[in-house]
């Protein structure tokens, strides 16, 4: 009698335990979702702002509404804009990783299956961040740069103001190295 050396997925018995969903975990899931949306907006803004054509920039400068004002202000210092986008996106992505790790640890006990725990916590979470926080927003904003720039103009303007001290250090260190 011959046996199959490779087990089928239904024959694999994972020794993991699930814990009940608590209020803290539910809040963590909601905040993680909000942070993924923030990551998407920040990532999309990078492509949107830096792919605006000169004619679109000229069109914006001729308008006198609030969104056009904020877009023009954001574009005044491309170094500050890029530094803000990079720093903010890193902060948000670190928050996503920390919260999702907490959430997974609170829901599932991978003590007896550390490799499966690694796959869930690192591979799947990285995939979610890349797909929903980076790739999809950048593809969308490539095709709708003006619309995306208008959507994120005011929040990005205030994010630039908040992160200016950190950005200044980043910009100074970059110019010092050059």
Model segments located where?
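Membrane-embedded alpha-helical segments of inner-membrane proteins
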Residues: 1-178
């Amino acid at each position: 009698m011959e046996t199959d050396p490779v087990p089928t997925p239904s024959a694999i018995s994972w020794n993991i335990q699930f814990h009940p969903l608590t209020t803290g975990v539910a809040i963590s899931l909601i905040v993680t979702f909000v942070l993924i949306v923030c990551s998407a907006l920040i990532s999309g803004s990078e492509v949107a702002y830096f792919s605006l054509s000169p004619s679109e920039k000229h069109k914006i400068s001729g308008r006198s509404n609030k969104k056009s004002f904020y877009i023009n202000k954001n574009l005044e210092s491309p170094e500050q804009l890029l530094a803000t986008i990079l720093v903010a996106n890193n902060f948000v992505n670190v928050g996503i990783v920390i919260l999702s790790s907490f959430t997974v640890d609170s829901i599932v006990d991978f003590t007896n299956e550390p490799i499966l725990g690694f796959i869930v916590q690192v591979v799947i979470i990285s995939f979610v961040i890349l797909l929903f926080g980076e790739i999809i927003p950048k593809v969308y904003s490539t095709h709708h740069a003006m619309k995306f720039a208008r959507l994120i103009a005011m929040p990005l303007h205030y994010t630039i103001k908040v992160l200016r001290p950190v950005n200044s250090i980043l910009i100074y260190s970059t110019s010092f190295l050059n």
